[in-house]
């Protein structure tokens, strides 16, 4: 289409509109914006301006440039003999200039300049190629000369060594000759001395002169021998020093030659730089040996095997071929003479053992997958030591993945684990510690991996929130021993009857309420006092600002009171003591104060920091003083939290409702929770579909320190989990799934590691009775408390085995699991549905319902007592004294006895005592009175008795009659 304005014309020319406006203004066409109209006249004026600015005088073309590209294929064999097809592309560029009579001189000058430029460029390239070839030839010549010089020096060294050896032999021969001459002279002197001794009397003066002359000759001979030995030693030292000097020079020359070969084999560019003389290459220093956590460092001698060196002369044939076509690689195909043929010739050069490319570097496209890139192919490098890898080990890893990280087969890992005494498969999950031991056993270095944890995003998000900190209500936890009146006290504050609604009159759930008082809002957490609810009390202390410790004035400090004090001190929370039940006649507040001082809680009147307030939950006395002290402590703490920010909190309690699904009671600690927010609590996530306050009324938002009940989570969260509001559901799902997988993998790895230990424990314990149980509770805290209480009942003979524990009603799956594991189902404040009851009756599964934790613990204890082996006890029923002994044929010995104490029964066992020492224990064979068999004989009567398998009865013996009874044991 026709371009009517500046913008369209610029789009047609494919150039920015701003640049076109500048060119139009330079041509004298005044256009202010891109939308201005553009006529054909304006375009013509712009074209004339551009032609003039680029040197054209008129519209005729003076010069034309032709570019021609030709592509062909050649077949070339590589180093392995395999034929390869290579694409060859030739590009040519020619410029034709149209000559005019008027401007012929100028055009001719321009053509000459262009030709001169082309010739200069061509000459420059040829000169560069020639210089590079000369440089490479010069380097090769220097290398050859250096090699020849080394050979000459080696020959000279050998000649010098031979001369030194000959000199040493000659010196040794001369020394031996001199020693022989000295020995002969000594023998002659000895003979002369003997002869002189005979003539001593005649010529004493002549004998002394001969002795002096002989001693001088011997000294001269010893001096000559010593000089000969010194000369031989000096010649040997000189030869050794010369040999060491030659070795050093040869090593330096070899290093220099190796450096030159490496430089010649690296890819060369067209631009030739000044070549510096190569420096001697120092041998690489061995890496510092480092030990690891599970495996110490190897000794110095075992770090590496010595490298196999190749003689320097072996690399010369391959190196001397390098200059032949070194410059052709960077030339254009048309510039050199047979560049491809020279390359092929180089590839067909002499090969070494470790070089498959013919001794020539192939450059960036030399081999498949970049093999041989920048490597020194002229020398063979044998592997010096095994490759040590740094293996990053995550928290859990399968055997196959671990083998892949070490680049070995999975069977090698399985072999190592079999040697360590563990049978595994390739899909088995290992924990981090075991995996690190295996990695170090295989000679690699193990590093604990830092996981790509999506939870790190939560920390980043927290650092970016800068909301205004505003005052918030205090969170007060009411703690104390069971039946000390915690809930009744809170009930009086709330003006509602909560304690009456709890089963058995004891609190079994953690309750959260906020109360509007004339002095401000206070949030109360009511915790159970029973010993089974330790975890609940710990959670209450964790989420609280102030602890109100309730102690009964008539009961004093009890075990759960001490535990509550420990929780408060561990959390660094201030304590306000409420001494309850002061309206009772037996109340003794002073005794309570003394007991609390012993536990480290000192009242303010004694110089401490804990207010003590006497109260009565029944009459309401002291309640106002208690609230006053609580709010005073809150003012001292200066409690603040951001309000206009995403909510954060803690799960106080959680349960599974049949109609509502997972329900969680949470305490908002900072920010504001709105209906519709995306929340993450542990492994559970979801959108807040409904939000209720503690009275069951719907609410749209909850600020800091306000407890609410939310619905819409994917599963029942764990009590005590942190609750966070996230911007989108995808992020919440990702973090929740990551936590689930991490928890599952860690649990599986720990179970696998503990299998062998548990097996050995069971083998050592022998016969242990197991009581399998399946526990279903209404809320998370009750289920947790019940499981802990029942597990504490386990003994060495009877063990409680929790097969499964969860929150919610009893379903068919629970009954099927109980059938398979032969377990008893315990429902705490839950019931079984119709299908589950029918299935339980059909399979004979025992389902027991409880709503008080005392009853559940007591009945399980009774069941465990019934599983204990009965205890056997002996009961002495009577004492018998032997008065006379009768020998009866075919029967044996019969004792005539008098029952002195108790009663004797025919079925009883008996001990025979002689002089108060037991000599036999057995059973009665017969019991007669006169000639009649009787069942029993009482005290004061006579009877005849015979003991089975015992006839050695004498007068005066005593029979102790006893019975063995079985007594049921209790825990």
Curated annotation (Swiss-Prot):
Subcellular location field: Cytoplasm
Region Disordered, residue ranges: 48-86, 101-381
Ranges of compositional bias, category Gly residues: 356-369
Annotated spans, G3: 526-529
Region (G1): 480-487
Compositionally skewed regions (Low complexity) per UniProt: 105-114, 182-203, 304-326
Region ranges (G5): 616-618
Pfam family, one: IF2_assoc
Biased composition (Pro residues): 277-286
Classification via PROSITE patterns: G_TR_2 (PS51722), IF2 (PS01176)
Stretches with biased composition (Basic and acidic residues): 48-63, 121-181, 210-261
UniProt entry keywords in alphabetical sequence: Cytoplasm, GTP-binding, Initiation factor, Nucleotide-binding, Protein biosynthesis
Occurrences of domain tr-type G (ranges): 471-640
Region described as G2: 505-509
GO terms assigned for molecular function: GTP binding; GTPase activity; translation initiation factor activity
InterPro entries: DNA-bd_dom_put_sf (IPR009061), EF-G-like_DII (IPR053905), IF2_assoc_dom_bac (IPR013575), IF2_II (IPR044145), IF2_N (IPR006847), P-loop_NTPase (IPR027417), Small_GTP-bd (IPR005225), T_Tr_GTP-bd_dom (IPR000795)
Region (G4), start-end ranges: 580-583
Sequence positions that bind GTP: 480-487, 526-530, 580-583
UniProt keyword annotation of Protein biosynthesis present: yes
CDD domains to which the protein is assigned, alphabetical: IF2_eIF5B, IF2_mtIF2_II, mtIF2_IVc
SUPFAM superfamilies: Initiation factor IF2/eIF5b, domain 3, P-loop containing nucleoside triphosphate hydrolases, Putative DNA-binding domain, Translation proteins
Record NCBIfam families: IF-2, small_GTP
PANTHER family, sorted: TR-TYPE G DOMAIN-CONTAINING PROTEIN, TRANSLATION INITIATION FACTOR IF-2-RELATED
Protein name (Swiss-Prot/TrEMBL): Translation initiation factor IF-2
Species annotation: Burkholderia orbicola (strain MC0-3)
């Amino acid at each position: 289409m026709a371009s009517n304005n500046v913008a369209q014309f610029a789009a047609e020319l494919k150039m920015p509109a701003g640049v076109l406006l500048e060119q139009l203004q330079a041509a004298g066409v005044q256009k202010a914006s891109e939308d201005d109209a553009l006529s054909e006249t304006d375009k013509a004026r712009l074209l004339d301006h551009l032609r003039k600015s680029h040197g054209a005088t008129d519209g005729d073309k003076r010069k034309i440039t032709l570019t021609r590209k030709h592509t062909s294929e050649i077949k070339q064999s590589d180093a392995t003999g395999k034929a390869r097809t290579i694409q060859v592309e030739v590009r040519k560029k020619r410029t034709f200039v149209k000559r005019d009579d008027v401007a012929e001189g100028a055009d001719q000058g321009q053509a000459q300049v262009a030709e001169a430029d082309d010739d200069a460029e061509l000459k420059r390239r040829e000169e560069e190629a020639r210089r590079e070839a000369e440089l490479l030839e010069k380097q090769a010549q220097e290398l050859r000369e250096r090699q020849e010089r080394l050979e000459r020096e080696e020959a000279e060294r050998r000649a010098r060594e031979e001369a030194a050896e000959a000199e040493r032999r000659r010196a040794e021969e001369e020394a031996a000759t001199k020693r022989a001459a000295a020995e002969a002279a000594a023998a002659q002197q000895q003979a002369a001395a003997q002869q002189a001794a005979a003539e001593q009397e005649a010529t004493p003066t002549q004998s002394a002169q001969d002795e002096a002359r002989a001693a001088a000759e011997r000294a001269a001979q010893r001096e000559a021998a010593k000089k000969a030995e010194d000369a031989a030693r000096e010649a040997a030292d000189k030869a050794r020093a010369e040999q060491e000097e030659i070795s050093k020079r040869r090593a330096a020359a070899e290093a220099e030659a190796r450096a030159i070969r490496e430089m010649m084999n690296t890819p060369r560019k067209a631009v030739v730089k000044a070549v510096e003389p190569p420096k001697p290459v120092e041998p690489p220093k061995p890496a510092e040996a480092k030990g690891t956590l599970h495996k110490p460092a190897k000794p110095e001698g075992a770090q590496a095997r010595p490298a196999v060196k190749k003689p320097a002369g072996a690399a010369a044939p391959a190196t001397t071929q390098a200059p032949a076509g070194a410059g052709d690689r960077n030339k254009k195909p048309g510039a050199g003479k047979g560049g491809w043929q020279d390359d092929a010739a180089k590839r067909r050069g002499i090969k070494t053992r470790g070089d498959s490319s013919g001794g020539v570097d192939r450059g960036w496209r030399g081999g498949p997958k970049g093999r041989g890139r920048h490597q020194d192919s002229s020398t063979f490098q044998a592997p010096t030591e095994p490759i040590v890898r740094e293996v990053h080990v995550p928290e859990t890893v399968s055997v196959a993945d671990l083998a892949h990280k070490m680049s070995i087969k999975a069977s090698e890992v399985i072999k190592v684990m079999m040697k360590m005494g563990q049978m595994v498969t390739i899909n088995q999950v290992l924990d981090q510690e075991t995996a690190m031991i295996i990695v170090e056993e295989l000679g690699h270095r193990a590093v604990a991996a830092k996981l790509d944890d999506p939870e790190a995003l939560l920390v980043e998000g927290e650092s970016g929130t800068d909301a205004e900190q505003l005052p918030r209500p205090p969170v007060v936890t009411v703690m104390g021993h069971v039946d000390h009146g915690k809930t009744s006290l809170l009930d009086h504050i709330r003006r509602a009857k909560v304690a009456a609604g709890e089963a058995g009159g004891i609190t079994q759930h953690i309750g959260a309420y906020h109360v509007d008082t004339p002095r401000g809002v206070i949030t109360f957490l009511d915790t159970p006092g029973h010993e089974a609810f330790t975890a609940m009390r710990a959670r209450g202390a964790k989420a609280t600002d102030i602890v109100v410790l309730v102690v009964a004035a008539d009961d004093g400090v009890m075990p759960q009171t001490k535990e509550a004090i420990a929780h408060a001190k561990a959390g660094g929370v201030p304590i306000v003591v409420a001494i309850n039940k002061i309206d009772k006649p037996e109340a003794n507040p002073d005794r309570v104060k003394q007991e609390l001082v012993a536990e480290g809680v000192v009242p303010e009147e004694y110089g401490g920091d804990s207010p003590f307030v006497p109260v009565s939950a029944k009459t309401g006395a002291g309640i106002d003083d208690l609230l006053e002290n609580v709010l005073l402590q809150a003012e001292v703490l200066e409690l603040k939290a951001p309000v206009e920010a995403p909510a954060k909190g803690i799960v106080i309690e959680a349960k599974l409702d049949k109609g509502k699904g997972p329900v969680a009671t949470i305490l908002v600690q900072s920010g504001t929770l709105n209906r519709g927010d995306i929340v993450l609590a542990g492994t559970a996530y979801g959108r807040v579909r409904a939000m209720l306050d503690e009275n069951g009324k719907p609410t749209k938002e909850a600020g800091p320190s306000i407890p609410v009940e939310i619905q819409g989570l994917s599963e029942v969260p764990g009590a005590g989990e942190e609750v966070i509001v996230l911007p989108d559901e995808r992020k919440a799902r990702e973090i929740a799934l990551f936590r689930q997988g991490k928890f599952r993998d860690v649990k599986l790895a720990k179970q696998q590691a503990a299998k062998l230990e548990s097996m050995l424990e069971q083998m050592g314990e022998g016969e242990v009775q197991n009581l399998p149980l399946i526990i279903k509770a209404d809320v998370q805290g009750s289920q947790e408390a019940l499981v802990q209480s029942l597990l504490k009942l386990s003994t060495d003979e009877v063990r409680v085995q929790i097969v499964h524990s969860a929150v919610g009603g009893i379903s068919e799956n629970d009954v099927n699991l109980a059938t398979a594991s032969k377990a008893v189902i315990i429902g705490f404040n839950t019931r079984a549905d119709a299908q589950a009851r029918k299935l339980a009756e059909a399979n004979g599964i025992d389902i027991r319902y409880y709503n008080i934790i005392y009853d559940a613990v007591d009945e399980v204890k009774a069941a465990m007592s019934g599983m204990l082996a009965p205890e056997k006890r002996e009961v002495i029923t009577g004492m018998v004294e032997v008065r006379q002994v009768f020998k009866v044929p075919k029967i044996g010995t019969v004792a005539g006895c008098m029952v002195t104490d108790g009663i004797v029964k025919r079925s009883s066992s008996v001990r025979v005592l002689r002089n108060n020492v037991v000599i036999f224990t057995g059973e009665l064979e017969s019991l007669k009175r006169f000639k009649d068999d009787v069942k029993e004989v009482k005290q004061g009567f006579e009877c005849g008795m015979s003991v089975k398998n015992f006839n050695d009865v004498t007068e005066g013996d005593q029979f102790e009659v006893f019975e063995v009874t079985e007594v049921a044991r209790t825990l």
